[in-house]
């Protein structure tokens, strides 16, 4: 594949993160994909938000798992934006989506939505949590899985292989050529997060990465 640019939570560097406004801006900016995060509400809706609680990014407070969809709908996520559910993002943008999940329960609900919406070929599922990825891979083996990790080492390749991931997403600050080569030799592509500065982009290309997640609409001038 060509070098893939992914709008991290949309373009969270300039728009309220994980909102429809942010995802649309990322698509308009020309990013190949958008990345988002999912948590389950008290009543089982797939809420698009990074944190487990609503405090940081809205005018509300509390854990997502303790709030109903209606309660979350009433919150302001910035510039008057509402917190979306996953299905709304599917409808709002045409580019492929990287959906990050945190647990097995979210994996099961997401699998159902992907089947219902016929989106198994359009959405790839990311996670730091191997069990969540393994669940998606077991339920929907046709869906692309992406292992996200902070720590590097020889364990990255076998971890990815166990959960069926053909792409890993790693911290640009810790990535090195040895890890990239090890992954590529195993047929696993490598992207980095979060690539924002001109130096970050230079490192990403020098390492021969396959893609990068960024908070910004465009690569900054060197």
Provide a role label for each language-model segment.
Residues 1-222:
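Phosphate-group recognition and catalysis centered on beta-loop-alpha active-site segments
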């Amino acid at each position: 594949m060509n070098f893939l640019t992914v709008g991290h939570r949309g373009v969270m560097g300039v728009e309220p993160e994980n909102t429809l406004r942010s995802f649309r801006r990322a698509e308009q900016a020309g990013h190949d994909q958008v990345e988002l995060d999912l948590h389950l509400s008290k009543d089982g809706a797939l809420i698009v938000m990074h944190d487990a609680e609503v405090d940081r990014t809205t005018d509300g407070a509390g854990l997502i798992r303790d709030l109903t969809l209606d309660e979350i709908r009433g919150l302001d996520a910035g510039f008057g934006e509402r917190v979306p559910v996953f299905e709304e993002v599917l409808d709002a943008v045409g580019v492929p989506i990287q959906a990050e999940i945190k647990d097995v329960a979210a994996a099961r609900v997401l699998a159902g939505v992907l089947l219902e919406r016929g989106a198994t070929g359009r959405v790839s599922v990311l996670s730091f949590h191997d069990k969540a990825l393994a669940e998606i891979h077991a339920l929907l083996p046709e869906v692309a899985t992406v292992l996200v990790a902070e720590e590097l080492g020889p364990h990255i390749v076998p971890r990815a292989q166990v959960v069926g991931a053909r792409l890993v997403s790693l911290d640009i600050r810790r990535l090195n050529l040895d890890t990239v080569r090890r992954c590529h030799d195993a047929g696993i592509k490598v992207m980095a997060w979060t690539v924002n500065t001109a130096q970050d982009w230079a490192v990403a290309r020098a390492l021969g990465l396959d893609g990068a997640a960024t908070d910004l609409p465009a690569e900054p001038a060197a």
